Amino acid sequence: MRVAMLTREYPPEVYGGAGVHVTELVAYLRRLCAVDVHCMGAPRPGAFAYRPDPRLGSANAALSTLSADLVMANAASAATVVHSHTWYTALAGHLAAILYDIPHVLTAHSLEPLRPWKKEQLGGGYQVSTWVEQTAVLAANAVIAVSSAMRNDMLRVYPSLDPNLVHVIRNGIDTETWYPAGPARTGSVLAELGVDPNRPMAVFVGRITRQKGVVHLVTAAHRFRSDVQLVLCAGAADTPEVADEVRVAVAELARNRTGVFWIQDRLTIGQLREILSAATVFVCPSVYEPLGIVNLEAMACATAVVASDVGGIPEVVADGITGSLVHYDADDATGYQARLAEAVNALVADPATAERYGHAGRQRCIQEFSWAYIAEQTLDIYRKVCA
């Protein structure tokens, strides 16, 4: 069996959960079968890379993406099965299936109709990305959802989709890469920032998008206990508008309290591991999240999590066991922000519970989110669609 794995992101260009998913999945699948990675961007080891047509440099970003999809589809002719990830490569998978009469497996990491804020980023291209996703999903031989909540969303958004074709295979975590680091050393990223190791610390890691709820967290931080520091590892803004909103919110917070740190540069895994391990609590304020690999990363570092109760997050963060879930209400932003602050303050005030949540979170990662198991599940899907 030869798999053509289609992805926008692949190391060293990985900036989101879908890229992490593909990276880890490929590493384990290659122990089981032949996998050719087809990605977008600059040439790199271990993958075939494709750039958008330069003649579309000033075109809408969706059109530019689709030009790379066409080349990617053409390159998948030798595959036994083609496996696409996100709308960015869904059309390539769909076309390869038609051209070469091979099965198409599609992993949905999010759903375009449930991310209306993408209009800010893509303009009319949002309608294109939505059309691409719908076309590919409804024609795929199998669809993988990264959580049960995601599967439910898919069947609701695409009611004509055959439920028997939609399988749940959750994201995973490599607990040998993500583990509790020792105390921050002199010269470490936290020491260089000036973070006080004797004060509690709440941490956020993620992209600056409306989906991730960064402004909700920064606003909630006005209600944090006065000794709580906030470390935001946040970059790769979707749009200048949302970047400006976060910038204004962080500046206002910093005027009103000490211990506000914003890291906009891309960090290494080692640096992120250090920050997550040092955190008193990791906060995930997402307003939409099919699963949320970053919660697994924090849990693997034995850190308690405070997270919204949206999407697949409750399938990762066990409320009252590995962290605290906070109800998100799109019609009550103020209430949501107050609840986030309350949950953070409660764990800061109870270090024993925070420590217990952290240890339980790491055990949950080890026992239930192994990439080796996820690769076996994925291979089973390939076998079924090729039978």
From Swiss-Prot:
Catalytic activity: ADP-alpha-D-glucose + alpha-D-glucose 1-phosphate = alpha-maltose 1-phosphate + ADP + H(+)
Activity regulation behaviour: Inhibited at high G1P concentrations.
Keyword terms: Capsule biogenesis/degradation, Carbohydrate metabolism, Glycosyltransferase, Transferase
Transmembrane segments: none
Annotated knockout phenotype: Inactivation of glgM affects the production of extracellular alpha-glucan (two-fold reduction), but not that of intracellular glycogen and 6-O-methylglucosyl lipopolysaccharides (MGLP). Cells lacking this gene are also impaired in their ability to persist in both the spleen and the lungs of mice. Combined inactivation of both glgM and ostA is lethal, potentially due to accumulation of toxic levels of ADP-glucose. Combined inactivation of both glgM and treS results in absence of alpha-glucan.
GO BP of this protein: capsule polysaccharide biosynthetic process; glucan biosynthetic process; glycogen biosynthetic process
Pfam families (UniProt xref): Glyco_transf_4 (PF13439), Glycos_transf_1 (PF00534)
First-level EC class: transferase
GO molecular function terms attached to this record: glycosyltransferase activity
Entry EC no(s): 2.4.1.342
Superkingdom of origin: Bacteria
Secretion signal span: none
Biochemical pathway: Capsule biogenesis; capsule polysaccharide biosynthesis; Glycan biosynthesis; glycogen biosynthesis
Further comment found in the protein's record: Maltose-1-phosphate (M1P) is generated by two alternative routes: the TreS-Pep2 branch and the GlgC-GlgM branch, however it seems that TreS-Pep2 branch provides most of M1P for the GlgE pathway in M.tuberculosis. Attempts to disrupt both the Rv3032 gene and glgA in order to create a mutant simultaneously deficient in both alpha-1,4-glucosyltransferases turned out to be unsuccessful. Thus, M.tuberculosis H37Rv requires a functional copy of at least one of these two genes for growth.
Primary role: Involved in the biosynthesis of the maltose-1-phosphate (M1P) building block required for alpha-glucan production by the key enzyme GlgE. Catalyzes the formation of an alpha-1,4 linkage between glucose from ADP-glucose and glucose 1-phosphate (G1P) to yield maltose-1-phosphate (M1P). Also able to catalyze the elongation of the non-reducing ends of glycogen, maltodextrin and maltoheptaose using ADP-glucose as sugar donor, however the rate of the reaction appears to be too low to be physiologically relevant.
NCBIfam families with a match to the protein in the record: glgA_Coryne
Family named by the database record: Belongs to the glycosyltransferase group 1 family.
Record's protein name: Alpha-maltose-1-phosphate synthase
Organism: Mycobacterium tuberculosis (strain ATCC 25618 / H37Rv)
